Protein backbone atom coordinates (compact mmCIF):
# COMPACT_ATOMS: atom_id res chain seq x y z
CA UNK A 1 0.00 0.00 0.00
CA UNK A 2 1.45 3.35 -1.03
CA UNK A 3 2.01 5.73 1.85
CA UNK A 4 0.45 9.19 1.55
CA UNK A 5 2.79 11.96 0.43
CA UNK A 6 2.82 14.53 3.21
CA UNK A 7 6.18 16.28 2.83
CA UNK A 8 8.23 16.72 -0.32
CA UNK A 9 11.86 17.76 -0.06
CA UNK A 10 12.79 19.95 -3.00
CA UNK A 11 16.55 20.41 -3.34
CA UNK A 12 17.74 23.48 -5.22
CA UNK A 13 21.01 25.01 -6.33
CA UNK A 14 19.06 27.95 -7.85
CA UNK A 15 20.00 26.86 -11.41
CA UNK A 16 17.73 26.55 -14.47
CA UNK A 17 17.63 22.77 -13.90
CA UNK A 18 16.38 23.45 -10.36
CA UNK A 19 13.63 25.73 -11.67
CA UNK A 20 12.19 22.91 -13.78
CA UNK A 21 12.34 20.62 -10.76
CA UNK A 22 10.50 23.28 -8.73
CA UNK A 23 7.56 23.17 -11.16
CA UNK A 24 7.38 19.41 -10.66
CA UNK A 25 7.68 19.72 -6.87
CA UNK A 26 4.90 22.34 -6.78
CA UNK A 27 2.61 20.13 -8.91
CA UNK A 28 3.25 17.14 -6.65
CA UNK A 29 2.65 19.25 -3.54
CA UNK A 30 -0.67 20.51 -4.97
CA UNK A 31 -1.85 17.05 -6.07
CA UNK A 32 -1.09 15.55 -2.66
CA UNK A 33 -1.84 18.56 -0.46
CA UNK A 34 1.72 18.12 0.79
CA UNK A 35 4.15 20.51 2.41
CA UNK A 36 7.28 21.50 0.51
CA UNK A 37 10.61 21.50 2.32
CA UNK A 38 12.93 23.67 0.23
CA UNK A 39 16.57 22.76 0.80
CA UNK A 40 19.71 24.50 -0.40
CA UNK A 41 23.16 23.35 0.61
CA UNK A 42 26.02 25.82 0.81
CA UNK A 43 29.06 23.74 -0.03
CA UNK A 44 32.41 24.69 1.47
CA UNK A 45 34.65 26.69 -0.85
CA UNK A 46 37.89 24.81 -1.43
CA UNK A 47 40.59 26.57 0.59
CA UNK A 48 42.88 26.31 -2.44
CA UNK A 49 40.36 28.33 -4.47
CA UNK A 50 41.02 31.34 -2.23
CA UNK A 51 44.76 30.97 -2.74
CA UNK A 52 47.40 31.33 -0.06
CA UNK A 53 48.98 34.31 -1.81
CA UNK A 54 45.86 36.43 -1.62
CA UNK A 55 45.24 36.60 2.10
CA UNK A 56 44.09 32.95 2.10
CA UNK A 57 42.01 32.55 5.28
CA UNK A 58 40.51 36.04 5.20
CA UNK A 59 39.51 35.76 1.55
CA UNK A 60 38.13 32.27 2.21
CA UNK A 61 35.90 33.66 4.99
CA UNK A 62 34.74 36.50 2.76
CA UNK A 63 33.83 34.14 -0.09
CA UNK A 64 31.87 31.94 2.36
CA UNK A 65 30.01 35.01 3.67
CA UNK A 66 29.08 36.20 0.17
CA UNK A 67 27.90 32.69 -0.78
CA UNK A 68 25.75 32.53 2.36
CA UNK A 69 24.21 35.97 1.69
CA UNK A 70 23.47 35.07 -1.95
CA UNK A 71 21.91 31.76 -0.89
CA UNK A 72 19.72 33.50 1.71
CA UNK A 73 18.58 36.10 -0.81
CA UNK A 74 17.74 33.46 -3.42
CA UNK A 75 15.88 31.41 -0.80
CA UNK A 76 13.78 34.41 0.29
CA UNK A 77 12.84 35.07 -3.33
CA UNK A 78 11.87 31.44 -3.82
CA UNK A 79 9.81 31.35 -0.61
CA UNK A 80 7.92 34.50 -1.65
CA UNK A 81 7.10 32.84 -4.99
CA UNK A 82 5.78 29.74 -3.19
CA UNK A 83 3.77 31.86 -0.76
CA UNK A 84 2.13 33.69 -3.69
CA UNK A 85 1.35 30.31 -5.26
CA UNK A 86 -0.30 29.31 -1.93
CA UNK A 87 2.08 26.38 -1.36
CA UNK A 88 2.82 25.37 2.23
CA UNK A 89 6.59 25.52 2.43
CA UNK A 90 9.51 25.64 4.83
CA UNK A 91 13.06 26.57 3.93
CA UNK A 92 16.24 24.93 5.09
CA UNK A 93 19.71 26.34 4.37
CA UNK A 94 22.38 23.79 5.18
CA UNK A 95 26.17 23.72 5.04
CA UNK A 96 28.23 20.79 3.86
CA UNK A 97 28.41 18.29 1.03
CA UNK A 98 25.19 18.65 -0.98
CA UNK A 99 24.16 15.02 -1.47
CA UNK A 100 24.91 14.11 2.17
CA UNK A 101 22.94 17.05 3.55
CA UNK A 102 19.96 16.46 1.22
CA UNK A 103 19.70 12.77 2.12
CA UNK A 104 20.13 13.52 5.83
CA UNK A 105 17.49 16.29 5.75
CA UNK A 106 15.02 13.99 3.97
CA UNK A 107 15.49 11.37 6.66
CA UNK A 108 15.46 13.78 9.65
CA UNK A 109 12.43 15.71 8.37
CA UNK A 110 10.57 12.53 7.34
CA UNK A 111 10.18 13.53 3.70
CA UNK A 112 7.92 11.25 1.65
CA UNK A 113 10.02 11.97 -1.44
CA UNK A 114 12.81 14.12 -2.84
CA UNK A 115 12.54 16.20 -6.02
CA UNK A 116 15.82 17.31 -7.56
CA UNK A 117 16.95 18.70 -10.91
CA UNK A 118 19.71 17.22 -13.03
CA UNK A 119 21.87 19.22 -15.37
CA UNK A 120 21.67 16.54 -18.03
CA UNK A 121 25.43 16.12 -18.27
CA UNK A 122 26.58 13.07 -20.14
CA UNK A 123 29.82 11.34 -20.96
CA UNK A 124 33.08 12.69 -19.59
CA UNK A 125 31.72 15.77 -17.86
CA UNK A 126 29.34 13.58 -15.85
CA UNK A 127 32.13 11.14 -15.06
CA UNK A 128 34.40 13.89 -13.74
CA UNK A 129 31.80 16.18 -12.17
CA UNK A 130 29.80 13.41 -10.60
CA UNK A 131 26.20 14.25 -10.01
CA UNK A 132 24.55 15.40 -6.81
CA UNK A 133 21.24 14.01 -8.10
CA UNK A 134 22.84 10.65 -8.91
CA UNK A 135 24.34 10.39 -5.44
CA UNK A 136 21.03 11.37 -3.83
CA UNK A 137 19.25 8.66 -5.86
CA UNK A 138 21.69 6.00 -4.70
CA UNK A 139 21.74 7.07 -1.01
CA UNK A 140 18.17 8.19 -0.27
CA UNK A 141 15.80 5.92 1.65
CA UNK A 142 12.70 7.51 0.09
CA UNK A 143 11.66 7.82 -3.58
CA UNK A 144 13.57 10.43 -5.61
CA UNK A 145 12.11 12.24 -8.62
CA UNK A 146 14.79 13.65 -10.92
CA UNK A 147 13.85 16.36 -13.40
CA UNK A 148 16.11 16.98 -16.34
CA UNK A 149 17.07 20.61 -16.76
CA UNK A 150 16.90 20.82 -20.54
Predicted regions and their residues:
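Structural beta-alpha unit
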Residues: 1-4, 31, 77-114
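Small/aliphatic-rich secondary-structure junction motif
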Residues: 2-58, 81, 85-87
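Gly/Ser-rich helix-loop-strand patches that form or flank binding pockets
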Residues: 4, 27, 104-150
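General small-molecule cofactor/ligand-binding pocket signal
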Residues: 39, 90-94, 145
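Hinge/beta->alpha junction and helix N-cap segments in small-molecule ligand-binding domains
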Residues: 42-43, 68, 97
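Generic structural signal for helix capping and beta-alpha/helix-loop junctions
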Residues: 45-46, 99-101, 123
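A short acidic, glycine-rich active-site loop
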Residues: 57-73
Amino acid sequence: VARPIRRILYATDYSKASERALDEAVNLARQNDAELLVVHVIEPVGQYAAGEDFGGAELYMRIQEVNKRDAERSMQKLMRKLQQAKIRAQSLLLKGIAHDQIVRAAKNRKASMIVIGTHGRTGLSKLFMGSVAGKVVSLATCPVVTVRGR
